[in-house]
Every structure is written in C-alpha cells, then in structure tokens.
C-alpha cells in the first residue's frame, strides 16, 4: 500500500513476519520492521488450536494456549485519521516451503522443554496442541534440541499499525469468537466441499487474508 502523499510504500514480507518501508522516488528500501508475536495465552488472544477436541470430536474450544502467533500478514491497506496515516493488515500466516525445506511441524512431533512445558504429554494430545502446526525453525532458544516456545503461523486477527510499524490495535480473538457466535456451523471451516466444523483450527484458524478500507460519509470502514 502507498501513503496518501505518494512518498512511501509499505510492503508485507509475509513469511518473514515483517514490514518493508520503501521510498518511492528513489526506489530504495528505507527500513524492514519485524512485527513481533502475539501471546495466545493472554485473555482476549485465545485460540482454538485443535480440529479434534475433545476426544477426537470437532467442537469449538477457544481457550488460553501457551503459543505465540506470528502475525505474517498477507494483505495490507492504509487509511488516514486526523492527518495520521495508519496501516491495516490481515494476519493470515504462511509457512516457508521450497524443495526439501519445510518449516511446518505439528506440536506432537516436537520435543518440548519440560521446564517450560511441564505438562508436555497432555499438551501433545490431539485435543490440545498436538495437531497445531507451528514452525520448527524458531523456539529452541537454548539451542539444546528441545523447544522452549511455540510459534504458530498467523495471528487469526487484523491489526492496525502506525507507519513506523508499531502496533496500535489488534482484534485479538474477535474473529474466532464472532464466527462462533454468529455462524457456529461454519466455525473455522475450510472452503472445500468436504470440510467439517473447525477443520482449520489446527492450521491458522479463520485465516484472514484480505484487508480493504473505504470511507463512507465521515466514517472509515475496513
């Protein structure tokens, strides 16, 4: 997206969880800003992390999980309020895969640090975090072969940032909570014909992909 005066462009670097700021006139890169992580253990940031809960049955279960979400936005748009430009992102998430390289693993396949995750066996159950896809390239902070933190793809939300890449708002778990309340039959549903309830819960959930902004009268809508 481009700011209103046409000076700078803002480009999402989705798989790298970052934002590039480009000077248009000189066609040069001004900055690359990391977007950070979302703590799904905090109230308001909860998630449904399994397509088989409880006991293998598909039931919506939006709760606190010891997982960080990588925002990894796909679409980005900009808008102005009181002379200040803001960016809005749809935090879809996407894994890096090419050739034999694949950073995607289910939590059940990873060795977790027992100090950080004392209930490892329970967490790796399919009804808990076992089915959740996370990156296998981030989280071994002690570099000892086990994972001290878990990072899932996408943040299941939309965010608003200032033009320096500082987050000023995130929708938290509103998308999952709203879909569950308004259309529970299609909660975390896939778009294919054979989808089932919460079939996407283990893989980016509602997966927001597009962001569009429009002004109607004096109000701005996204």
Located regions from the model:
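Beta-sheet-rich non-transmembrane sensory/scaffold domains
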Residues: 1-222
